């Protein structure tokens, strides 16, 4: 055990024996402080420059020599480096002449922009926690716990964006990938270091969730939002604007309505989309916050496209609908990609919207249907269709009371439902599928590990006959079998056979206590943010 790790463990023990203010914020001896700075900069190529910059940030902050000032300085350093990387990307774009490379580079600019935003949010949240507001991470208060969850969520997302950027160069000569990779490596490593330190310094003891079914609304959801979700007739919802393909609304296209919606709105903006088939690709940017799309029902209001990897696009860019503005809600809508299995990756819905909710929606495609890319997401009473890895990404996503349907793949292809992309054990990401139905029409596997720490759990879920006895599939060879976290609890149906499941070190047939840590109440602290929106959700384990 290295000196910096030992130091962090000592401080972690202190957190639980005395107040945060006296353990984490007290002045540290300069030698110990230097060890913390070194840990913040470990594995950074320009190590000495990183150390120097963090020292400068600490001095400028005026918060003294303590672990928190190092964390805040490291986040600022990551933010500054991400901004610098984003500014350099257009230069690389000017060098490329191939269309797929151009798309990949454009993706990188947007994704690094996501990281800049998420790191900025993280700095603001750290200021709330430790900037003199009197909030103590160890006092059990709502504000402290919620802010801590926000930090881990945003840092987890900021760590993943750079990977998605580089994945976009699949199918290219990758020479421009190398130019971009150098700028991104330092950002990713800095965020990884901060997550590691933050997790060790602020780990909280296990608290089991209560086993109950409640109607609850998160703090970020207003009473107006709740009442909107409970109304079954869109015509009485008093939407801000109406889209109708037949011309009987203010707009004929959804894109027109979104473009006219206010930017950075703190209030819910409701767009009612009347029944019809809308052939358009929608990209709801970060600035479009608190947008709500309401349709006339699954199969009635349909947004459809056919973008796909074989057209020279990245997976990220194939989405029929992409949402990244915070607080997005969709109700009674079908999201569809019709590219078919022969065209490989073809996303119907990509979600980078923090605190987003999807209620009574259908997401239909083949390979890579639902891209739960990042941040906190909730799906209730939804239907998901696909063939390969059709629920994938590195968001913190819960699917509850949903129906998952498999479709016919290409010959020799194997049907896999999930491919969760958790890269670090410190990321608070993963997929939880609870109280749902896996309705397999083909031999089907529950998931496979896309990244080293892939995490997916099925609980209280019905599995039909064609779910294979072994349950799960390798990505390749023994990759991630020791480090992934896959679990099942209290599943039923002919596709659930405990005796035949894989024997990987990372696979678990969970007992009740372990399962409780993956409930909405514990795994993602759902009582604070999951958008129940007036719809009953199970906070603990179902009966």
Curated annotation (Swiss-Prot):
GO MF terms here are: enzyme inhibitor activity; pectinesterase activity
Q: Which CDD domains match?
A: PMEI-like_4
What the protein does comes down to:
Acts in the modification of cell walls via demethylesterification of cell wall pectin.
Region: Pectinesterase inhibitor 22; residue ranges are: 38-197
Active site, per annotation: 368 (proton donor), 389 (nucleophile)
Q: What is this protein called?
A: Putative pectinesterase/pectinesterase inhibitor 22
Subcellular location, record wording: Secreted, Cell wall
Q: Annotated site (Transition state stabilizer), which positions?
A: 367
Catalytic activity entry: [(1->4)-alpha-D-galacturonosyl methyl ester](n) + n H2O = [(1->4)-alpha-D-galacturonosyl](n) + n methanol + n H(+)
Secretion signal: which residues? Answer: 1-19
Q: Which gene encodes it?
A: PME22
Glycan-carrying positions: 211, 263
- What organism is recorded for this protein? Arabidopsis thaliana (Mouse-ear cress)
GO BP term (any one): pectin catabolic process
Q: Please list the residues that bind substrate.
A: 315, 345, 448, 450
Disulphide-bridged cysteine pairs: 382-402
Q: Into which EC class is this enzyme placed? A: hydrolase
């Amino acid at each position: 055990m290295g000196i910096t790790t030992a130091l962090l463990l000592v401080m972690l023990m202190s957190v639980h024996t005395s107040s945060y203010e006296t353990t984490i914020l007290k002045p540290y001896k300069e030698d110990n402080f230097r060890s913390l700075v070194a840990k913040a900069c470990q594995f950074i190529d320009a190590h000495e420059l990183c150390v120097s910059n963090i020292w400068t940030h600490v001095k400028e902050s005026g918060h003294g020599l303590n672990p928190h000032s190092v964390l805040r300085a490291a986040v600022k350093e990551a933010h500054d480096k991400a901004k610098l990387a984003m500014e350099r990307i257009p230069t690389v774009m000017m060098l490329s002449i191939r269309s797929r490379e151009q798309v990949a580079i454009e993706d990188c600019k947007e994704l690094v922009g996501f990281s800049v935003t998420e790191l900025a949010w993280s700095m603001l949240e750290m200021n709330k926690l430790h900037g003199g507001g009197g909030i103590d991470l160890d006092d059990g208060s709502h504000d402290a716990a919620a802010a801590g969850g926000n930090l881990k969520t945003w840092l987890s997302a900021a760590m993943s964006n750079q990977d998605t950027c580089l994945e976009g160069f699949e199918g290219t000569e990758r020479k421009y990938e190398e130019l971009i990779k150098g700028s991104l490596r330092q950002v990713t490593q800095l965020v990884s270091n901060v997550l590691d330190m933050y997790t060790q310094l602020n780990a909280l003891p296990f608290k089991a969730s209560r086993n109950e079914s409640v109607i609850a609304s998160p703090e970020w959801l207003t009473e107006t939002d709740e009442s909107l979700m409970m109304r079954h007739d869109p015509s009485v919802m008093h939407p801000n604007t109406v889209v109708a393909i037949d011309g009987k609304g203010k707009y004929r296209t959804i894109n027109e309505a979104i473009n006219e919606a206010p930017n950075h709105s703190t209030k819910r903006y409701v767009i009612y989309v009347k029944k019809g088939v809308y052939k358009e690709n929608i990209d709801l940017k970060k600035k479009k916050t608190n947008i709500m799309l309401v349709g006339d029902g699954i199969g009635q209001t349909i947004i459809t496209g056919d973008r796909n990897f074989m057209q020279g696009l990245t997976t990220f860019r194939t989405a029929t609908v992409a949402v990244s503005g915070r607080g997005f809600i969709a109700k009674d809508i079908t999201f569809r990609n019709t590219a078919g299995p022969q065209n490989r990756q073809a996303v119907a819905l990509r979600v980078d919207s923090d605190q987003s909710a999807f209620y009574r929606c259908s997401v239909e495609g083949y390979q890579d249907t639902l891209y739960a890319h990042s941040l906190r997401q909730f799906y209730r009473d939804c239907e998901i269709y696909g063939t390969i890895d059709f629920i994938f990404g590195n968001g913190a996503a819960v699917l509850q009371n949903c129906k998952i349907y498999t479709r016919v793949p290409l010959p020799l292809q194997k049907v896999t439902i999930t491919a969760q992309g958790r890269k670090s054990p410190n990321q608070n990401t993963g997929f939880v599928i609870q109280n749902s139905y896996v309705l397999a029409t083909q031999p089907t596997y529950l998931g496979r590990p896309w990244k080293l720490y892939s995490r997916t759990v099925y609980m209280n879920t019905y599995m039909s006959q064609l779910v294979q006895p072994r349950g799960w599939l390798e990505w390749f060879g023994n990759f991630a079998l020791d480090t992934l976290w896959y679990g099942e609890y209290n599943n039923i149906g002919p596709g659930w056979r405990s005796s035949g499941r894989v024997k990987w070190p990372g696979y678990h047939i969970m007992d009740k206590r372990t399962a409780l840590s993956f409930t909405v109440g514990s795994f993602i602290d759902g009582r604070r943010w999951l958008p129940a929106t007036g719809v009953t959700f199970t906070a603990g384990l179902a009966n």
